[in-house]
């Protein structure tokens, strides 16, 4: 029997098949700011070109005769940022002149000349560019005629590093600069974490990182998590930490630190890229040697690890449509990895033999594949008289698998201790908090409520669209109140 896989691996495109020269597929000449566009700088004969590949229409690349030192496409629209301009190659101005063009309108939107060379830059949102110089980091908004604003000075721990990435949380209150350098026959990762509110930096040893928003069970607001992976002399680690003060009323996230496994034959391997899937609350970690690691963000459990590319994947972005990660390797393959929805829960349950994690992820992401686990848990709690817990399991089980007439009948048969809420009403209470009741649930909830003469409750639920209207419900209301 072939083993089920919890991931889906896809090759979207081979860049050499759409006219891209293999020599142009590198960190210095190819950029991918999102899953929408790939941008390549190429020399064709004597002329310099910028090639834009729309990943929704990859067989029709747009070629423009542009001479630039660097080119990055906006993550959302056909807007391109160019560094250096014709005639500045090799001059002091090459790294300082920044221009933003709207490709469709064929118009220049903004331009700015920096005092210092920009050695790394990145779109951090559809309307903001981050600019990194040897000494500082700036944010440049596309709004109006605003100038780049200095966010922070670089920490000395990044001196002499090649800057490979820059990340922010969604509100741009936490900023992170990542660099690497060769030391004692290994690649060392150096990061600078900066808090805009506190105006202070923390140097951290790390190779790849990402921020994530994660809503813990029972919390009203999502927690802002900082996830980073590192390979030190001692070994590999993944850390997941909540940054800043937890939002009011939230339980704090317990920080996690787990080992990142590197096989014996990958002595010099290290993490190079990380993306967090908001869709599945998982971390995708990619290493220099082309291994993918998949972690659950809540528990930091490693769900899966395998080699997906024999060549280094040197640029990645979130793959929005699948909740996955997309990347380009040195060979010019455009690859993506995402969660295989139908397989991940059975895989965690049977291959990892971790039913608790299977239940958690199934509930969190409304995924099928753990039906028998939910039925077993519900029956066990019910038999133990833990009706409130059983009600929670029945209400939260994915795809409504336990929201059946049988479940309601089971709760109806349980005697209610004097002065306490009946288990049936506890069950309906949880369902009402979550959204609309189905036809059968609506009838069975309204029956005892109308018998108690509490018609105003029913009117409230109808107004809030919590009940599914049906002929039978109408008849029930008429019987209780013929007026």
Q: Positions of the model-derived regions?
A:
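PEST-like, low-complexity acidic/proline-rich intrinsically disordered segments
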Residues: 1-13
């Amino acid at each position: 029997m072939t083993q089920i896989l919890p991931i889906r691996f896809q090759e979207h495109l081979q860049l050499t098949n759409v006219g891209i020269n293999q020599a142009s597929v590198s960190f210095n000449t190819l950029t991918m700011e999102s899953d929408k566009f790939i941008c390549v700088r190429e020399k064709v004969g004597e002329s310099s070109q910028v090639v834009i590949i729309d990943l929704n229409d990859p067989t029709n690349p747009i070629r423009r005769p542009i001479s630039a030192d660097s080119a990055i496409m906006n993550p959302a629209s056909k807007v391109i940022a160019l560094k250096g301009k014709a005639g500045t190659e090799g001059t002091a101005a090459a790294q300082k002149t920044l221009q933003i063009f709207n490709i469709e309108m064929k118009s220049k939107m903004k331009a700015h000349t920096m005092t210092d060379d920009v050695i790394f830059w990145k779109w951090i949102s559809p309307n903001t560019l981050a600019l990194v110089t040897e000494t500082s980091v700036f944010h440049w908004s596309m709004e109006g005629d605003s100038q780049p604003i200095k966010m922070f000075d670089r920490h000395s721990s990044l001196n002499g590093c090649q800057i490979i990435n820059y990340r922010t949380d969604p509100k741009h209150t936490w900023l992170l600069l990542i660099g690497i350098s060769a030391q004692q026959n290994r690649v060392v990762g150096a990061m600078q974490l900066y808090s805009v509110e506190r105006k202070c930096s923390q140097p951290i040893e790390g190779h790849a990182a990402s921020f994530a928003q994660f809503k813990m069970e029972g919390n009203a607001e999502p927690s802002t998590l900082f996830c980073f992976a590192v390979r030190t002399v001692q070994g590999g680690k993944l850390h997941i930490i909540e940054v800043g003060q937890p939002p009011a009323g939230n339980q704090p996230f317990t920080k996690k630190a787990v080992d990142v496994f590197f096989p014996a034959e990958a002595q010099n391997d290290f993490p190079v890229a990380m993306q967090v899937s908001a869709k599945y609350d998982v971390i995708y970690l990619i290493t220099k040697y082309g291994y993918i690691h998949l972690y659950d963000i809540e528990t930091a459990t490693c769900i899966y690890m395998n080699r997906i590319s024999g060549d280094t994947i040197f640029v990645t972005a979130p793959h929005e449509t699948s909740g996955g990660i997309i990347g380009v390797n040195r060979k010019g393959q455009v690859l993506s990895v995402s969660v295989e929805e139908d397989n991940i829960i059975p895989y965690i349950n049977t291959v990892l033999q971790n039913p608790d994690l299977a239940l958690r992820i199934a509930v969190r992401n409304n995924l099928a594949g753990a039906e028998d686990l939910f039925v077993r848990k519900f029956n066990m709690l019910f038999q133990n008289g833990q009706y409130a817990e059983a009600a929670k399991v029945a209400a939260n089980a994915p795809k409504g698998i336990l929201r059946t007439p049988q479940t309601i009948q089971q709760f109806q048969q349980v005697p209610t201790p004097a002065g306490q809420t009946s288990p049936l009403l506890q069950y309906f209470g949880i369902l009402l908090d979550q959204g609309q009741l189905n036809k059968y649930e609506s009838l069975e909830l309204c029956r005892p409520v109308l018998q108690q003469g509490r018609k105003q409750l029913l009117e409230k639920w109808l107004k809030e669209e919590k009940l599914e209207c049906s002929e039978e419900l109408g008849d029930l209301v008429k019987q209780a109140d013929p007026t």
